[in-house]
């Protein structure tokens, strides 16, 4: 299945280039990539559990934690799609208006650019709430993953704001997207780990 998804996403990537950054195709390409990350993350944690059977402690997956993780995963996917849309629109506007400054390019975007920032800080508060839930009752791999999620979201917000106010290299955008994609996979791993620990 993973091999099929990789091939399909590669083919869709070629279509993205030939379509001159069609926003719908770019978003579809990103959705497929995130689905691939989720599948690979699930396969990774399943393999890890088989090899390290004794590494998991008896931890109950509470309803609060379950709902928080599912909500966090959904919000991150939406956040990535919003960011992809913003980046695509900026590049399309820059092609049509090559003399626009960075500020003018940002001003040309719709109001959903603010939604991207608001959602980012919502993710930060939600991840902080998860850290609070894991503070006393959770140990080992699960707690490490929760703190990694919180730290990565903080770094992503910092990097996103730096990209707005400073002329950072183009590779920064790539790392910004990669970091968010890692979060999608880490949440899948964490949720699956807790499900296992509950059983």
PLM-predicted stretches and their roles:
Residues 1-199:
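Polytopic transmembrane helical bundles with strong interfacial aromatic enrichment
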């Amino acid at each position: 299945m993973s091999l099929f998804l990789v091939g399909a996403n590669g083919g869709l990537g070629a279509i993205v280039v030939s379509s001159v950054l069609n926003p719908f195709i770019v978003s579809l390409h990103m959705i497929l990539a995130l689905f691939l990350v989720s599948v690979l993350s699930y396969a990774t944690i399943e393999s890890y559990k088989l090899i390290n059977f004794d590494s998991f402690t008896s931890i109950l997956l509470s309803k609060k934690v379950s709902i928080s993780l599912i909500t966090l995963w959904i919000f991150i996917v939406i956040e990535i799609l919003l960011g992809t849309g913003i980046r695509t629109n900026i590049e399309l506007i820059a092609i049509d208006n090559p003399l626009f400054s960075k500020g003018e390019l940002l001003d040309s975007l719709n109001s959903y650019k603010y939604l991207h920032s608001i959602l980012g800080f919502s993710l930060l508060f939600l991840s902080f709430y998860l850290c609070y839930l894991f503070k006393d009752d959770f140990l080992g791999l699960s707690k490490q993953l929760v703190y990694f999620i919180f730290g990565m979201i903080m770094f992503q917000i910092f990097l996103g704001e730096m990209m707005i106010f400073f002329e950072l290299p183009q590779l920064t955008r790539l790392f910004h997207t990669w970091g968010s994609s890692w979060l999608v996979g880490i949440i899948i791993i964490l949720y699956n780990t807790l499900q296992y620990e509950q059983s």
